[in-house]
Amino acid sequence: MITLAPSLDTPKTDQNQVSDPQTSHVFKSKLPDIPISNHLPLHSYCFQNLSQFAHRPCLIVGPASKTFTYADTHLISSKIAAGLSNLGILKGDVVMILLQNSADFVFSFLAISMIGAVATTANPFYTAPEIFKQFTVSKAKLIITQAMYVDKLRNHDGAKLGEDFKVVTVDDPPENCLHFSVLSEANESDVPEVEIHPDDAVAMPFSSGTTGLPKGVILTHKSLTTSVAQQVDGENPNLYLTTEDVLLCVLPLFHIFSLNSVLLCALRAGSAVLLMQKFEIGTLLELIQRHRVSVAMVVPPLVLALAKNPMVADFDLSSIRLVLSGAAPLGKELEEALRNRMPQAVLGQGYGMTEAGPVLSMCLGFAKQPFQTKSGSCGTVVRNAELKVVDPETGRSLGYNQPGEICIRGQQIMKGYLNDEAATASTIDSEGWLHTGDVGYVDDDDEIFIVDRVKELIKYKGFQVPPAELEGLLVSHPSIADAAVVPQKDVAAGEVPVAFVVRSNGFDLTEEAVKEFIAKQVVFYKRLHKVYFVHAIPKSPSGKILRKDLRAKLETAATQTP
């Protein structure tokens, strides 16, 4: 069973309520609040309208195009739920899903919800230490994965596969592992009757938040049902999806943006989801053309490929009506380049944070009755939520066109960080406001623009790279006395991690040696792209790294490069 850090109840506010003078500038959606069925467990909410589209396609899997209907998806998920129960997984237990995009990922996630357990999703490309950090902190009882990743799971830190924890593989199982059929061939009538409360945890992605190392983010059934409803429910949904739509799912489902805004939103709306395990431009374009993909959820590097790759001209992408870019800011030039490539599509951005469930705002150009929107905006705050912008120094709320830290309040935000009261309290204040660590402003038309970041996090192609994690590894090297990691802007990736390193006295150390030392211990997107050797790391009197000074050094160096 998992133990949660004490949560802070989110205050309920009237639609037009004005708070005290200290928090008087509160922004709401242009769309009216709606009733939300967030009393339902997540799986029940997603399948609430199943009878209306039971025989329509739900999942279309990759180049082979194997298709599962909604009825298939519900049945197989129910069988796996029974199978998990047969293996001893109880309400509140944690199951790790260590898979690339696949139908088995979807079935497993829904099955975990059905028995009141908790899914912690992890990147299968993580190194063994990265996987076991999440596995250990989450106290997972079972891992669902592929055989190719099992070697990473053997005898790490004394935990014995098959004895201390179970591993189920979706393909031929290696020694001491179970085959997925022990789950998928169970009798669906054996799913136990479990009382699930809206505040029970259902998902535990890991996020660094505004600072520090990755932490378990407790998302409840209420969190995720509310977030999905804010996007796709109501007479005029913010994200208008129909049973005729086919959504592109090339972004990894272990990332909350893809899990929520692609998979869960599609399930609720009865749309089909085209699953791709990895991004390969030729395959992507062929599948979009073959399956008449109508909604593409993307990140800026994918936008770059669609806007600039010459292969795009050889395919018919006229079926695409919506392109939603998220996970990292999209530059105006890139946005304009894609508009020129796909003039028929509505292009807009969403803005989110894992801890916020994750969607804070979304382009209203995606609504059933769309609004005019501005280039560069990441939309307006989602309905049934409140947003404010505060001065990071004073905490005073700010009005229109005044940049400050963005804060969000609503029933979609996380319950808290797993076993970390201090981090929870520093992120969600006593009034229920979640502080994002992002700097932005709201313009006169209620559109949100992100301009900077208070938090330390680096975003590489939408993936989180926590500087503290890399700094901890760097200073563990005997030849390194001190180190700091900061982001450097990059056209293709958005940001890349670079390190400033202080050598220990008498030690000789090369840039390549430092890069190799880190590369052996982390997933590919956390690898260092540049190492600068310095005499000292700039720090405040309290010992905090002055990251702004280091970022300024990078910018100066960039302007001086011929």
Curated annotation (Swiss-Prot):
Positions with a binding annotation for CoA: 278, 461-462
UniProt key word Magnesium: yes
Record-given protein name: 4-coumarate--CoA ligase 2
Region feature (SBD1): 280-349
Annotated GO MF terms: 4-coumarate-CoA ligase activity; ATP binding
Entry domain remark: Both substrate-binding domains (SBD1 and SBD2) are involved in the substrate recognition, and are sufficient to confer the substrate specificity.
Species for this entry: Glycine max
Binding site for (E)-4-coumaroyl-AMP: 257, 261, 327, 349-350, 354, 362, 455, 459
Similarity section: Belongs to the ATP-dependent AMP-binding enzyme family.
GO terms under biological process: phenylpropanoid metabolic process
Highest rank taxon of the organism: Eukaryota
